[in-house]
Every structure is written in C-alpha cells, then in structure tokens.
Amino acid sequence: MSYNLIFTEQYENIERRFLKRHPDLLDRYAKTLAMLEHDPFHPSLRLHPLQGRPTGLHSASINLQYRITLELELREQDIILVSVGSHGEVY
C-alpha cells in the first residue's frame, strides 16, 4: 500500500530553506520521504502524534535532531507535509 505525499506551497518554502541550510541531509531526507510514502509506520521513522496545539499533527524523524511534522489522513491515504526542521523549530 502506498501513501500520497502532499507538498503544500508553504511546506515547499520551508523545505527549500531547510535543505539550503543542511545540504548534508539531502540523502537522509529523501530516504525519509520514500519511507513515509511506502510505510509511514516504519519503526525507524518514530512516527507519533503531537500533544497539545496544534491538534491533529504527527511527527516523523529524519534523524535524532531533525523532524518532519505532518497531517496523516488514513482514509484517503494522504500525508500532508507541514514543516521540516530541528526539534525546536517544528514543535
């Protein structure tokens, strides 16, 4: 089963800045997106719901320091990417 990654314009702007600051993470970031698309519940992503506000968001790990926040729509199998950055930037 495959999921649809939805890149909003806002996310693409955040992503562009993130990759410009961290070009060394490009391969790991691409692998994380591929895993999200194939199996968002893969243990290495450490997918978990975020507590508090805003509600309805989840977090997936790129590595120990960087995360992707996302909305997970299981019925439509859509994953709406919200933000990417360090732990402090996305929470």
Regions found by a protein language model. Name each.
Residues 1, 43-46, 77-80:
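Residue-level signal for beta-strand positions within conserved beta-sheet cores that form or flank
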Residues 13, 31-34:
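Generic recognition of well-ordered alpha-helical segments
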